[in-house]
């Protein structure tokens, strides 16, 4: 059996530049890959570490869809599991009692994605994604 792989963790921040500065200092000066997703009213900064991607997320506008999915509170927001097929994973997880949020699967920041309703046992949002190839950090 292949071990599951956590693709990334998502952290909502109120001030992206301040959060980048703090995380960069913590990670020894590592620079993030930054991008804007205007269709979702999001600014994202990704720190690629040896074993995990830390995704800092800042809302850039009303973000009706993104806020509805992820909520507005700052802090650790979601844990994302990499899967080969979002459709197959949705079926498997539905049988285990996970409920996909309305509007998923869809294209997201990391390829095909699906968010689930907030987990009552952990308080976290879980996301699955079939990641596209990422650019390597310089």
Regions picked out by a protein language model, each given a short descriptive name:
Residues 1-2, 6-14, 45-48, 55, 67-87, 90-138:
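Vicinal oxygen chelate
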Residues 48-49, 57-62:
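A glycine-rich, hydrophobic loop/mini-helix early in the fold
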Residues 37-40, 71, 106-109:
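A short beta-turn/loop motif at secondary-structure boundaries
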Residues 32-34, 63-67:
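A short, acidic/glycine-rich surface segment
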Residues 18-21, 86-91:
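Short, conserved charged micro-motifs
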Residues 1-42:
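Long, hydrophobic N-terminal alpha-helical segment
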């Amino acid at each position: 059996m292949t071990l599951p792989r956590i693709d990334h963790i998502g952290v909502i921040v109120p001030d992206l530049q301040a959060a980048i500065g703090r995380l960069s200092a913590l990670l020894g000066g590592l620079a993030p890959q930054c991008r804007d997703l205007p269709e979702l009213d999001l600014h994202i900064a990704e720190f690629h570490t040896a074993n995990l991607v830390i995704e800092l997320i800042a809302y850039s506008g009303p973000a009706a869809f993104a806020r509805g999915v992820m909520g507005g509170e700052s802090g650790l927001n979601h844990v994302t599991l990499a899967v080969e097929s979002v459709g197959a994973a949705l079926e498997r997880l539905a049988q285990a009692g996970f409920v996909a949020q309305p509007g998923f699967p869809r294209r997201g920041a990391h390829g095909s994605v699906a968010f689930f309703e907030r987990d009552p046992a952990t308080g976290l949002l879980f996301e699955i994604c079939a990641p596209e190839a990422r650019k390597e950090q310089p």
